[in-house]
Curated annotation (Swiss-Prot):
UniProt name for this protein: Pentatricopeptide repeat-containing protein At1g31430
Region described as Type E(+) motif: 529-561
Similarity field: Belongs to the PPR family. PCMP-E subfamily.
A Pfam cross-reference name: E_motif
InterPro entries referenced in this protein's UniProt entry, alphabetically: E_motif, Pentatricopeptide_rpt, PPR_At4g14850-like_plant, TPR-like_helical_dom_sf
UniProt GO molecular function: RNA binding
Gene this chain is encoded by: PCMP-E55
Organism: Arabidopsis thaliana
GO biological process, one term: RNA modification
Superkingdom of source: Eukaryota
Lineage: Eukaryota, Viridiplantae, Streptophyta, Embryophyta, Tracheophyta
PANTHER family the UniProt entry points to: PENTATRICOPEPTIDE REPEAT-CONTAINING PROTEIN
Chain positions covered by the region annotation Type E motif: 453-528
Transmembrane segment boundaries: none
PPR repeat residues: 10-44, 45-79, 80-110, 111-141, 147-177, 181-215, 216-242, 243-277, 278-312, 313-343, 344-378, 379-414, 415-449
Length: 570
């Protein structure tokens, strides 16, 4: 019997079984069967290897991938376009993008799949400039015509980079030489939205005969990202199919632009429609509660999470911690924090900041040291939180030590916000010379960054009667063109304290010339789940509960006067 005649059908049978397993995503079984094939003394061919290489990529088995690549070289299969393209796909899945490009460069012949594979590999690894570079190279070096894969992958890179030039070039190609598929239409809408060309995105959207929910979501997101919330809602209502991503995009828009009541109303509509919210929806709503101080609504969402047995992962848990902390319920925030099974950097940082903002700086520092001890990675935001705690608690020595530990122990480079925290801490403690020295080291920063720290030092100089520093800072501020009214107002106050009225007039005139106006102070409060906002100088007569407000003010004033009289009498 001729054995060579038996090997072909046996290999064919193995190839069919391997493909069936790969189609069913049983990638581990693919590798096991491949090992069995090799044990039988069979030689994999250009149909076997692509299936195996795909499975290796999905399982991220680097060593196995290198072995199969070595076999392909020995067997003379590496230059087969099907095998080469599969090698590129495997290395891209393994994150080895340089080897992916090397395989591409060594191919004697490249088809459109090869070019698309390299472009999508760069896109998948976040190297969007390189993806655009490959697209340009394909245009110049190859006579191959772009296909849907080329267009969609390159448009993804354009979206990420906001590269309108290449995006419009592809759009013109599609209009003149290609048919507008749903995938291409989605990619064009997304690209134009990300580049801020809403009208062009809408034109493409309206021209599409068939649209899926992804296309509707991209267009809604485009309107939301530019603040055109009402137009987004109209389009949202028109969408024939609404998945959880579309609902989330619309709700995020309301939260982002402080229209929280409408976000909650939409959430209730979502429940009525029978759409189960995912964690992204809940995090968005909890963020809105935190931003507006809507404690009752936050508690209601927490109740919904418990009643529906939603898994409180580290993202949802952190959002709950943040919401309770910002609403002043710090003990509840602590309870939620310690219930989170896998706490990450964001979880710890959120609670540290919450403790600091609720006047518990000592506990915030304790938590910071606990975070260090358990080995959680500290990032730049963590240090802003802990330095804020030092600032609020007046812990000068701890603040200095932690600031210096950023580079010495944690390999985190201090940024302007960290310096600002330490400068403010030093100013509050009256260590003005040290604060000024630190500001001098920030001279490379922008005016918008320097003005707040100058203001801190100027305010401290005024409070501590340090005229020399006040005048030095005033000189620096006079040279800065800023739109922040507080800097100019504070400078005028310093001059007024020194009876330099002509300088006060000059500052006021400069504010007028620059069109800078001092915005009135504002305070807000939530009562029975309803938010109320009060602005200095505002006409309160229009408030529906003005009589009750006045009555309470009179009662409070009388109570304070009574207490004052009792203290005087005693």
């Amino acid at each position: 019997m001729n054995m060579s005649l038996l090997q072909t059908p046996s290999l064919l049978m193995y190839n069919k079984m391997l493909k069936s397993l790969a189609d069913g995503k049983s990638f581990t079984k693919v590798l096991a069967l491949f090992g069995e094939l090799r044990g039988q003394g069979l030689y994999p061919d250009n149909f076997t290897l692509p299936v195996v290489l795909k499975s290796i990529g999905r399982l991220r088995k680097v060593i196995e991938g290198e072995k199969v690549h070595g076999y392909a070289v020995k067997a003379g299969l590496e230059f087969d376009s099907y095998v080469s393209n599969s090698l590129m796909g495997m290395y891209a899945s393994l994150g080895k993008i340089e080897i992916t490009h090397k395989v591409f460069d060594e191919m004697p012949q490249r088809d459109v799949v090869s070019w698309n594979g390299l472009i999508s590999s760069y896109v998948g690894n976040g190297r969007f400039e390189d993806a655009i570079g490959v697209f340009k190279r394909m245009s110049q070096e190859s006579n191959l015509k772009f296909d849907e894969g080329t267009i969609v992958s390159t448009l993804s890179a354009c979206s990420a980079l906001k590269n309108l030039e290449i995006g419009e070039r592809i759009y013109r190609f599609v209009v003149t030489e290609f048919e507008m598929s749903v995938r291409i239409g989605n990619a064009l809408v997304d690209m134009f939205c990300k580049c801020g060309c809403l009208d062009k995105a809408r034109a493409v959207f309206d021209s599409m005969r068939d649209k899926n929910v992804k296309c509707w979501t991209s267009m809604v997101f485009g309107y939301v990202s530019t603040g055109r919330i009402d137009e987004a809602r109209v389009l949202f209502e028109r969408s024939p199919v609404k998945d959880v991503v579309l609902w989330t995009a619309m709700m995020n828009g309301y939260v982002q632009f402080n229209r929280f009541d409408e976000a909650l109303e939409l959430f209730r509509c979502m429940q009525t429609a029978g759409i189960r919210p995912d964690n992204f929806v809940l995090v968005s709503l909890l963020t809105g509660c935190a931003q507006t101080g809507a404690l009752e609504q936050g508690k209601w969402i927490h109740g919904y999470i418990n009643e529906n047995r939603v898994t409180v992962d580290k993202v949802v848990g952190t959002a709950l911690v943040d919401m309770y902390a910002k609403c002043g319920c710090i003990e509840t925030a602590l309870e939620v924090f310690y219930e989170i099974k896998e706490r990450d950097t964001a979880s710890w940082t959120s609670l540290i900041y919450g403790l600091a903002m609720n006047g518990m700086s000592g506990r915030a520092l304790d938590l910071y040291y606990e975070m260090e001890n358990v080995g959680v990675r500290l990032d730049a935001i963590t240090f802003v939180a802990v330095l804020t705690a030092c600032n609020h608690g007046g812990f000068v020595a701890e603040g200095r030590k932690i600031f210096h530990s950023m580079t010495e122990r944690h390999n985190v480079q201090p940024k302007s916000e960290h310096c600002s925290c330490l400068i403010d801490l030093l100013c509050r403690a009256g260590l003005l010379d040290e604060a000024e020295e630190l500001i001098d080291k920030m001279r490379g920063e922008s005016d918008e960054t320097l003005v707040p720290v100058y203001c801190s030092l100027l305010s401290a100089a005024r409070n501590y009667g340090n005229v020399k520093i006040a005048e030095r800072v005033a000189e620096k501020l006079e040279k800065v063109e800023v739109s922040d009214s507080s800097a100019h107002t504070l400078l005028a106050s310093v001059y007024a304290s020194a009876n330099r009225w002509e300088d006060v007039t000059n500052v006021r005139r400069k504010m007028k010339d620059l069109g800078i106006r001092k915005f009135p102070g504002c305070s807000s409060i939530e009562i029975d789940g309803v938010g109320h906002e009060f602005i200095v100088g505002d006409d309160l007569l229009s408030h529906p509960k003005m009589d009750e407000i006045n009555s309470m003010l009179h009662q409070t004033t009388n109570l304070m006067l009574d207490l004052e009289h009792k203290e005087i009498d005693s």
